[in-house]
Amino acid sequence: RAALAESDAEANDLTAECTIHLPEDTAEFAARFTDGKYDSRISFTAKEELTIDVPGEAAGLYVAWYTAPEACVVESLDADGNVIKTESADTDLLNGYYVLPSGCAGVRISGGRAFAISELGVYDAETPPEALCIMSVQKTQPKVMLIVTHTGDEAYYFGSILPFCASEDVAVAFIMARSRTAQQEAIELQYALGSRMQPIFAGFQYF
């Protein structure tokens, strides 16, 4: 726990120093990116883009997607607006952390398809703070899979075995999730237990 605190202390949140540029019809909702509510979001059409002016110390960008992006690109820009790095967002992850190169003055996020973002953060560290709970994609063929119906069921019914699910060879899968917040809570629980593999969310309608 002390090590986690030290890691977070080394990463400074620079989000307040950034300038966010949104399409005109959603510009008034910029505060949704930092309200800590994963169910609030700003949606973009396939033709719209988000740009962020970042300070010189910026080294990492956190994006909490409302749904896993289907075709999004994160571009780092220099002071003249030239692209100096391009990275495709992982289509299987709800939360991403993207390293910004030296000389980065801005970031542009766009997609070949519609997308939505719940939270944004800019930090002065290439390594994501532990509090963000950044995870990796589950293995294609894990040795063990724990399948539960709803988010929250894993703790209620299987709480005693969850500590043993931290291995990368174990996948936790949810048939349905009540909300994006519920998905985030499931991610944070698995992360706290030591897992670095994001749970699988099948996406069936909640009932």
Spans of model-derived segments:
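Non-catalytic accessory regions used for complex assembly or targeting
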Residues: L61-A64
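Active-site rim/loop-helix segments in enzyme catalytic domains that contact anionic ligands
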Residues: D39, E70, E87-S88, D92-Y97, ...
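Disordered, acidic Ser/Thr/Pro-rich linker "stalks" and the adjacent N-terminal cap
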Residues: A3-A58, A68-T86
